[in-house]
Each structure stands twice: as C-alpha cells, then as structure tokens.
C-alpha cells in the first residue's frame, strides 16, 4: 500500500431539522391546541483512531464527507429523527488541523480515540413549545441550525519509540530487517528506502519496542533536498534516536566525521527540539574492517566530534553487536517514562 502522510479533506455536518407548525385537528375539537413537534439534530462528524490503518492514502479517493440533516418535526408532537453521526477512521498518530486558521484541533494517539471535527446543527422547535397561558395558539417555530463546515489538514506522525537516522546507505534498513520482522528494501545504492518503515523489535515475549526507519538524509535536507526531510517529522514522537554511521564507506571521500556533522546540522535546522533529543551513535559495517582498524577509526570519530553519549559498534549484515544494542535500547526505554519528554518541553 502506498504511504501517504498528509491529506486535505472537507467535512460538513448535517443541519438540524425544522420545527413543525401544526394544530390538533380532531372530530368535535375544531380549535385544537398546537401540536407541532421539534426537528431532529443534524449528524456530527468525528475522526476515530484505528490501529489497523497506517496511511492516509484512502483520502486520495474520498476527501469530502457530509453528514445528513435531521428530519423536520411533524404534527401530533412527533419529533423528527436525528441524523446518525459519521466516524472517519484515521491511523494512530494523526493530527487534525484547521486548514484556514492553522489551529490544531486534536492529536489521535490511542486506539478508539475520537475527535469531533464538525458538530451537527441543533434542532428547531415546534410551535407546541411556545404555548403559554397568554398564547394558546402560537404560530411561532424555529428552524434548525446549520451544521459546521471545515476544511481539515490531516498530518500523520508515526508512533515509534526509536528513530533511525543516517545518510543514505548507512545500513538502517539492514538493521531493522536484522532485528525485526519488517522487510524494507535493501540495496547498494542511495534512497532504497522511499518511505518510513516501522519494525517491532521483540526482546522477549513480554518486552518490545517500535523502531522507525526513514529515508536517509543528505546535505541540504532541511531545505528540502533528498527524501528524508519530508519524513523527519515522524521522529518527533520518538524517545531515542539511533544515528547510524558507515565506518567503511565505499567512497573514500565520504568522511564518517563529516557525515555525523552533516546530520546534526540538518537536524538543528529542521527542529532544535529534535536535535536536542537523546541520541546514540551506532557505528555500522564493522565487518568490513579489521578489529584493530575498527577501534582506532571509531575512537577517532568520537574524538573529532567530542561525542559523550553512548556508542555502539555493530554489523547489521552479520548481526554482530545487534543484540547488545537492542537490549540497551530496551533498558533505556524502560527507565525513561514516555511522558518525560513531553514534560520537559
């Protein structure tokens, strides 16, 4: 299925039904009192989070949603039937924005969570409502109110615990294939990952975390170059970033130190908050160099960039070091509350 993470839709709630103007007409009662009933309420429109959906692609085909109006009231004090509400399923992690004002209406992060995006119009009142001691035969009624109408911008931000960062061909997709059941495309050319992939990494039967692999970043990504910038927003909900560094690049001109610095610059320009997030270095493709060269090369990179946070050496292809890394990630996630990041902002 094609991955779509933004959509524009129009929602129009139903209008309320009108109140009825009616008087009792029965045998031997020529001047019966008012018996006009109220109208029904118009249907409202809700978004509902569905864990079985992972893209907004369906809105490419249907982008206008309209609820029915309530029925008008009838004589004999019969109330018009209210219209049924409409529930539009969206993926977990969907934000709903008012397109014209830019107002955030809500963020759907829990299965079954609902968000009212267009309220149905209130019903009109029948003339029976206006009977009083001084007005025995009121001819007054009210009309139903119109329903709300909005243009919404839906934006999907994937829900993941861990985000994978790095230049194209740093080995992120190979890693996520190694430690999870996800199957992103892997090849020896840039941009084999064209959209985000989620992988569930299971430590044991009771412990797991979700990792997000996004397309690799390149110099100038924050200004729109390459593919990764469009998907950086999917890392905003993560609690840990794993920065993958190719310690044995195919091109000798590609310096691992320059690669690390380039990624940090792009993160800082895109979002200072994202750049300040907890981040670990993962030196990948260590199977391509000798043990002695591996140690010296990794130490040189750490020294050059003055890195003081955790560092891991792995080979995503052979699996060397991967179990140690994912167990450390699991331990970190268990120690850090999911709400700690939100509280600090």
From Swiss-Prot:
Subcellular location: Cytoplasm
Residues in OBG-type G domain copies: 160-334
Sample GO molecular function, one term: GTP binding
Chief site of localization: cytoplasm
Keywords: Cytoplasm, GTP-binding, Hydrolase, Magnesium, Metal-binding, Nucleotide-binding
Cofactor(s) listed in the protein's UniProt record: Mg(2+)
EC number: 3.6.5.-
InterPro entries: G_OBG (IPR031167), GTP-bd (IPR006073), GTP-bd_Obg/CgtA (IPR014100), GTP1-OBG_CS (IPR006074), GTP1_OBG_dom (IPR006169), GTP1_OBG_dom_sf (IPR036726), OBG_GTPase (IPR045086), P-loop_NTPase (IPR027417)
Residue ranges, annotated region (Disordered): 127-148
UniProt cross-references to CDD domains, sorted A to Z: Obg
Biological process according to GO: ribosome biogenesis
Binding residues for Mg(2+): 173, 193
Gene3D superfamilies: GTP1/OBG domain, P-loop containing nucleotide triphosphate hydrolases
PROSITE patterns per record: G_OBG (PS51710), GTP1_OBG (PS00905), OBG (PS51883)
Subunit structure: Monomer.
Similarity field: Belongs to the TRAFAC class OBG-HflX-like GTPase superfamily. OBG GTPase family.
Protein known as: GTPase Obg
The organism of origin for this protein: Nitrosococcus oceani (strain ATCC 19707 / BCRC 17464 / JCM 30415 / NCIMB 11848 / C-107)
Gene: obg
């Amino acid at each position: 299925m094609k991955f779509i993470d933004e959509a524009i839709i129009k929602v129009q709630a139903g209008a309320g039904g009108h109140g009825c103007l009616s008087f009792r007409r029965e045998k031997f009662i020529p001047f019966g009192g008012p018996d006009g009933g109220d109208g029904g309420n118009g249907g409202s429109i809700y978004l509902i989070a569905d864990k079985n959906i992972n893209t907004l692609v369906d809105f490419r085909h249907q982008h206008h949603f309209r609820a029915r109006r309530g029925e008008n009231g009838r004589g004999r004090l019969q109330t018009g039937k209210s219209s049924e509400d409409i529930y539009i399923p969206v993926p977990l992690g969907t934000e709903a924005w008012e397109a014209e004002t830019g107002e955030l209406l809500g963020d759907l992060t829990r299965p079954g969570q609902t968000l009212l995006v267009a309220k149905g119009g209130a019903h009109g009142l029948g003339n029976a409502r206006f009977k009083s001691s001084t007005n025995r035969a009121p001819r007054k009624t009210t009309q139903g109110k119109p329903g709300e109408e909005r243009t919404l911008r839906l934006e999907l931000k994937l829900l993941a615990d861990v985000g994978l960062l790095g230049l194209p061909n740093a080995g992120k997709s190979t890693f996520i294939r190694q430690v999870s059941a996800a199957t992103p495309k892997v090849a020896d050319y840039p941009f084999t990952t064209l959209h985000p992939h989620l992988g569930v990494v299971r430590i044991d039967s009771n412990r797991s975390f979700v990792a997000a692999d996004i397309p690799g970043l390149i110099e100038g990504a924050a200004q729109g170059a390459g593919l990764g910038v469009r998907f950086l927003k999917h890392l905003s909900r993560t609690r840990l970033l794993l920065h993958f560094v190719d310690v044995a690049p195919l091109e000798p001109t590609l310096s691992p130190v320059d690669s690390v610095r380039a990624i940090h610059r792009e993160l800082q320009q895109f979002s200072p908050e994202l750049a300040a997030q907890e981040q670990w270095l993962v030196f990948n493709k260590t199977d391509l160099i000798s043990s002695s060269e591996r140690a010296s090369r990794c130490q040189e990179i750490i020294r050059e960039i003055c890195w003081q946070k955790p560092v891991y050496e792995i080979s995503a292809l052979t699996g060397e070091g991967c179990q140690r890394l994912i167990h450390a990630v699991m331990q970190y996630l268990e120690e850090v509350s999911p709400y700690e990041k939100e509280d600090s902002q």
